[in-house]
Amino acid sequence: MHFRLNFIPEDQNEHHVFRQKQKEAFGGGEAPVMSVEEALRLVPNLSQFNADEDDEEFDAEGFYSTKLSELSCLTAGADGLSGRGLEVCYEDGAYNVCIGTPSTRADWRIALEYLKNLALKMDGEITSEDGEKFSAQNIEGFDFESDIRAGLANIKRNLEEKAVMCTIYGVRNEVSFDQKIIARIMDAPDPADEFSKFVTDIQNLNAYFSDQMFSGINEDSEIIGRYILPQDIATVLPFEPSVDYNNLQILGGKEVSRWSVAIFGGDEDHCEKYDILATLKYENFIQNLPKDKYE
């Protein structure tokens, strides 16, 4: 079974954390920790994005019965609506709900509804990371619009000062920004709406997002990063390759010396005849793409 986390660490990405203490059990002590299934029931039509349920190794009964205290974090959202979703974890007798900065308007509305229902279920106050208190009656009035504006301004500033590309993580796919994209968002009549649409559309693309593969990791040689491009399948590749956050630990701090694209294909009626047809330098492949194939 494969799990993923969508938010990058605090030193690389800002986020808001809201804390809700666990309810006391009747007669004293803490009530049982919610399972994944119970946590998802707090908001209608909420789905998990930790695991691929189409994976033949996915154990639905085992996963949904898992207590949040046994899971590093539950990534949740509304399929088709969420851009970045929210993360729920349990530690030190409390539920922590994390929302990335910036997140989409739909993400925030779902997260605030989640916090409201969590507060009702736990019959207690919600506390933000800066100590501000909220109740189930007023949490939905949290000013998330200013948080979206601040997050977009931070991306813009990073691109202007040092970064060639800024990347955030969505419920399904990464979202990258360069100066052209962030300028289009910031110049829109409603930047938060433009950002929300951009991020959510990328999560709902009917395309294969190419996975990264690496060679030379366990050898005393250069590390080569590779993207797989299948024949006859709509595939999304980054304009400029960089190591996905989920792969940083695999590399153990080592740098990728070069990137390539491996074109994979063969006879669709005979899977055993599929093979790598060609391997190209990444920059050469991108430079030779027709202009209508990328923005």
Q: Where are the model-predicted features located?
A:
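Acidic (Asp/Glu-rich) sequence patches and key acidic residues
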Residues: 1-295
